[in-house]
Design a protein with these regions (language model features):
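Conserved ABC ATPase "signature" region
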Residues: 72, 83-101
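H-loop/switch region of ABC-family ATPase nucleotide-binding domains
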Residues: 165-166
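Conserved ABC ATPase signature
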Residues: 105-109, 113
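The feature captures the beta-strand-to-loop junction immediately N-terminal to the Walker
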Residues: 6-8
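Conserved beta-strand-loop-alpha-helix hinge in the C-terminal portion
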Residues: 185-209
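ABC ATPase nucleotide-binding domains
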Residues: 202-236
Length: 236
C-alpha cells in the first residue's frame, strides 16, 4: 500500500523516516521493521531486499559521472554477477522509462528525471519497504503525474511505500491511507476520502471548493466527473 504522512514543518516527519531507516537512533521507544527490532539488524542486512530510502534531494544519491556508473557501482556492492549486471540495470531503466538517461550526468537531468533516476537506484536494492521524503518537491505537473503512476506500479508489485509530504493533492491521488503528524505524534490515520473530507486545513483544493455540492470528492478528476454526471458546468 501507499501511506502518506502530512503535517507542518518541524512536526517530525523527516525525523521519523530517518529513525525507521536507521540513519538516526530514537531517544526512547523502539522501532521494528518486518517484525524485527532495528538494533538487531547487522551491517547491510536491513538494506538488501528489505528497506530503501529516498531523500528529499535526489541529487544526494548520485556519486558518479553518469547514472549508469552509479547503478553499476551499487549493483556490484550488492554482489550482482558481472554477467547479470547489464540486464539488471536495463530492467530497472525500462520500468522507469529512463534508458535514454543512463549515460547522462545526474546533475544535468531535470527535477523529474533526477527523481526517477534516483528511484531506479534504490530499486536495485529490491526493497519491500520504500521511504520517500517529499518526492514531489521541485518537479513539474507532468513529472508529478509520471511519479504517481510509478508509485502505483510499485504498489502493484508488492512494495509498501511510506511517504511524507506537504503535497495534499498528490497524497490524495496516490495514497491508500493518509495520516496527520502533529507535535511528534501520528494523531489520525484514515482513507484519503475520510482524511481529507473531515479536515478543514489539511485538505485538497478540489475538496475545499466542491464540498458544499459533493461531500466525498477530493481530487480534480473526481469533481469533474461528478459535474459531468450531474450536468453541471461549474461550481458556485
Amino acid at each position: 500500500e501507499v501511506v502518506s504522512l502530512l503535517g507542518g514543518n518541524g512536526a517530525g516527519k523527516t525525523t521519523l523516516l530517518s529513525v525507521i531507516s536507521g540513519t538516526n537512533r530514537p531517544y526512547y521507544g523502539k522501532i521494528e521493521v518486518f517484525g524485527k527490532r532495528l538494533q538487531k539488524y547487522r551491517g547491510k542486512e536491513l538494506y538488501i531486499r528489505k528497506l530503501a530510502s529516498l531523500p528529499q534531494n535526489p541529487q544526494t544519491v548520485f556519486l558518479k559521472m553518469t547514472v549508469r556508473e552509479d547503478y553499476e557501482e551499487l549493483a556490484k556492492v550488492l554482489g550482482c554477477k558481472k554477467s547479470e549486471l547489464e540486464d539488471k540495470i536495463q530492467a530497472v531503466a525500462q520500468q522507469l522509462e529512463i534508458t535514454h538517461l543512463l549515460d547522462r550526468h545526474p546533475y544535468d537531468l531535470s527535477g523529474g528525471e533526477q527523481q526517477r533516476a534516483a528511484i531506479g537506484k534504490v530499486l536495485l536494492l529490491e526493497p519491500r519497504l520504500l521511504l520517500l521524503d517529499e518526492p514531489t518537491k521541485g518537479i513539474d505537473a507532468w513529472s508529478k503525474r509520471q511519479l504517481g503512476n510509478l508509485l502505483k506500479d510499485l504498489r502493484g508489485q508488492g512494495i509498501t511505500l511510506l511517504m511524507v509530504t506537504h503535497d495534499v493533492e498528490f497524497a490524495a491521488e496516490v495514497s491508500d491511507r493518509c495520516g496527520l503528524f502533529f507535535d511528534h505524534e501520528i494523531t489520525s490515520v484514515d482513507t484519503p476520502e475520510e482524511f481529507f473530507c473531515n479536515n478543514n486545513y489539511y485538505t485538497t483544493a478540489a475538496n475545499r471548493i466542491s464540498r458544499q455540492q459533493y461531500e466525498n470528492a477530493i481530487t480534480c478528476e473526481e469533481v469533474i466527473e461528478l459535474c459531468r454526471q450531474n450536468g453541471r458546468k461549474s461550481i458556485r
